[in-house]
Amino acid sequence: MTKYKSTDQVMKIISDKNKIRNFGVIAHVDHGKTTMSDSLLAHSGIISPSSAGSALAMDSMKAEQERGITIVQANVTLHYQEGENDYVINMIDTPGHVDFSGRVIRSLRAIDGSVVVCDAVEGIMTQTETVTRMSLEERVRPVLYINKIDRLIKELRLTPEKMQETLANVVSDFNDLIDTYAEEEYKEKWKVSIQDGSVTFGSAKDRWAINVDIMKKKGVTFKDVIDA
């Protein structure tokens, strides 16, 4: 992700439809969707890095700020650069509470892929299953972001080996959902894996995330990440 682009620069990029990506962030309530969105906004230069995680910029309604939950879906356009290529990413932050599931479905019908945010300690919860099922029913391919890794370190004080086991269990449980709800032709194709980079883990509150591709590029191990 790179810094803020002017409207003219964005318009130039989106003149090529192949440079546009649309994705939504879906999750169980309080698993860190909006905090993760804050981190992406900060990395793009839209909000201050110091306010990421507390600004809850995608929760613009007073009721959302007061209750600490997302009630209506909100969208933002971000710039992303990979190598020499520029992309425009339209991100939708969706509600996590079961009462607002209808708004999640509407968002899923406007996107290419979904990021399922899951608390590393709580794992797959009821609404995690619900929004993942919705994504699969709308033929929107999900990837997995395991959030709140800091809780495994600071609260549970797990060893790196035990943490890897915990993360593997979350991935396995998530793939069980895909096996249960995906159409037959996608059951194996859409399963996520740490090894292929479709699983990312991190701490949205602390504004970091990493997957196997990044670890290979930077030459770091899982233990290096934890020790840092």
Where are these regions (language model features)?
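P-loop NTPase catalytic nucleotide-binding module
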Residues: 1-29, 120, 124-228
